[in-house]
Amino acid sequence: QKIFNIEAITIAPFKHSKWQKTVSESIDASYNEACKIFDLLDLKDKSLIYKGSRDYLKNGYNEKNPAINKIIEIANKNNKTYILAIGCLTNIALALKYNPEIVDKIEVIWLGSNFLFGPNKDFNFAQDIEAVKVVFESKVRLTILPCSPITSNLMTSIYELESELKGKNKLCDYLCYRFYNRSHGPTKRWPLWDISVIAYMINKNWFNTIDISCPLINNDNTFKFTKNRHNIKFVNYLNANEIFKDLFEKLTSDNI
């Protein structure tokens, strides 16, 4: 809140084979996790957190929900709103479907597809491909930070996290605990993809981007490159050292 005017935290659906939860249950689990982070930061007001879509567009889900309603409300009242998406695009796609007029008032920064670098196996893309199609076709201003091989460079280990964070505050201790106990044990390095989206908004000088014509998504979910469609931004480099330096400084600050 000291850097950005955060108006909402919206929960996106997810489903992964490692987690035995339905898509709907994942919304509640993510909501509870967001509330826990608020508690660790001594933030009492959890009204900023909104539950989102309980299924994917690709499964026929087409319902309004608190997250979609809030996205539309915020977009309509502001001249410009940045939406930082670290999951699938279901909530954003439905907001655009229900209120297409917001397209000129929002900009989406998405941890998403890696189609410029070979076969696209990105998790956030595959979760709800129909939502990606809606967002691409809307012509919304869009920046994509591909998971592999770009944001996957944000690799860390429990040794680094404990060296930089452990004992600094409640949140830092919890983040170390979560990293270690999500199967990222002492011998495993793991990328913190999600921090890239926030870092991009903090300092774009840590990134290189290129403008490309928005691709089409084929029926087999591959991409067709184009030349004359609207442009989107695509991140093709990041400075991991600067991003981690800033992250550790902020997490251990007395003002957190």
Labelled PLM ranges:
Residues 1-256:
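N-terminal acidic, glycine/proline-rich low-complexity segments
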